[in-house]
Amino acid sequence: MSKIYVLDTNVLLQDPNAIFSFEENEVVIPAVVLEEVDSKKRYMDEVGRNARHVSKLIDALRQKGRLHEHVPLDTGGTLRIELNHRSFHQLQEIFIEKTNDNRILAVAKNLSLEEETKENGRPVILVSKDVLVRVKADAIGLLAEDFLNDRVVDNDEMYSGYKDLYISQQLFSSFYGKNQISVNDVKQHAFYPNQFALMKDELGGSSSAVGIADKTGTVLKRLVFDDEHIWGIRPKNVQQTMALELLLREDIPLVTLIGKAGTGKTLLALAAGLLQTEDLGIYKKLVVARPIVPVGKDIGYLPGEKEEKLKPWMQPIFDNLEFLFNAKKPGELDAILAGIGSIQVEALTYIRGRSIPDQFIIIDEAQNLTRHEVKTLLTRVGEGSKIVLMGDPEQIDHPYLDSLNNGLAYVVERFKGQPISGSVKLLKGERSGLAQLAADLL
């Protein structure tokens, strides 16, 4: 039996192509949704871009028929702009205020009631990214779903960048003697390029080692940087060791680091960037950026000069730089950075759209980027540059993103089989016991 899917505005603003995601079913867009989309077209951010894209898609579909009737889609389904079924009679005793959310609920509920009177009535399902809209729908007896087509993977299945590998003492001897072993010698295991193997004794002994798959995924090699001490820090756990290996390898220009606050992502990335920029001269500049304000905003509306506006948003970066430079007095770090000149701390707004060659680029809080934003960013990376995306997918500030459809998760999953990239999920916090407990419990 076919179904009727009523789309909320946030679904279209998250994915303009959502109307093509419902196979051979009917897609209904309430008129109020078009009004909300229209109000967002002037925005110069991702939401505005998607609003303009949706408008163009729907306009193109006008050529196939009348939008208030049934326009055929390539999926085998149909699209309809719903101008009627706006009565609040079924909602007024529960939701008195005529907000746009409630108007969308009214359309879906009235359509559902109409279908119930038919002999072969179809299920009506409201699709929304808004949790409270789905809760309201349930309260009035209306089927509701989240839009899941934009999710790259289930949370428990997100690529960690490593896996346990139990091997024999003979293979341990071969690994330490030849600095590598063939994946063919490890039964029932396959590896992505640059995926780590946490090797353990299959008989329960104390032997252990960490290897990394080569570019073909057929050989496990010893780490190049397995005991590094850079800029006064060294890895405190095996995940940090693996992260540092990726950060220091010139042949891996894309690195993704996932972890909660306190797992060492920012400190390790900054130390690796400083080493390769200031000490080794591999890169001409170290650029650190993060998306700093809610969607649809910019720091231009804040008072003060650019540096004054950036300071509060970028303070976590400056805190780590103060630690690495051992800056203890107020203003000392500013003087150090001004003297060096090759370290640039920016809002993401200021580097997006530029070509970025020969630079070590760190993007913090990358979980707040959309797929389009992260694509735009990566396609601007110039020759000879390395880019590090890091963040915690469980800490999303973007209104239309979640832990499974954000730009960081998207890159991790899409690039996990590519020889130019590597990823590590850091699990252990290295701050105080209180900080780790707070990250786990709160």
Swiss-Prot record:
Q: Which GO terms describe its molecular function?
A: ATP binding; GTP binding; helicase activity; metal ion binding; nuclease activity
GO cellular component annotations, sorted alphabetically? cytosol
What SMART domains does its record include?
PINc
Q: Where does ATP bind?
A: 259-266
Top-rank lineage group of the source organism:
Bacteria
Q: Which UniProt keywords apply?
A: ATP-binding, GTP-binding, Helicase, Hydrolase, Isomerase, Magnesium, Metal-binding, Nuclease, Nucleotide-binding
Q: Which reaction does it catalyse?
A: n ATP + n H2O + wound RNA = n ADP + n phosphate + unwound RNA; ATP + H2O = ADP + phosphate + H(+); GTP + H2O = GDP + phosphate + H(+)
Stretches assigned to the PINc domain: 3-135
| EC numbers, comma separated | 3.1.-.-, 5.6.2.5
Cysteines engaged in disulfide bonds, as pairs: none
A Pfam family of the record is PhoH
Q: What does this protein do?
A: Unwinds and/or cleaves 5'-tailed RNA in vitro. Has ATPase and GTPase activities. Unlike the protein in mycobacteria there does not seem to be an antitoxin gene upstream, suggesting this is not a toxin-antitoxin system.
Protein family (similarity comment): In the N-terminal section; belongs to the PINc/VapC protein family. In the C-terminal section; belongs to the PhoH family.
Protein name as annotated? Protein PhoH2
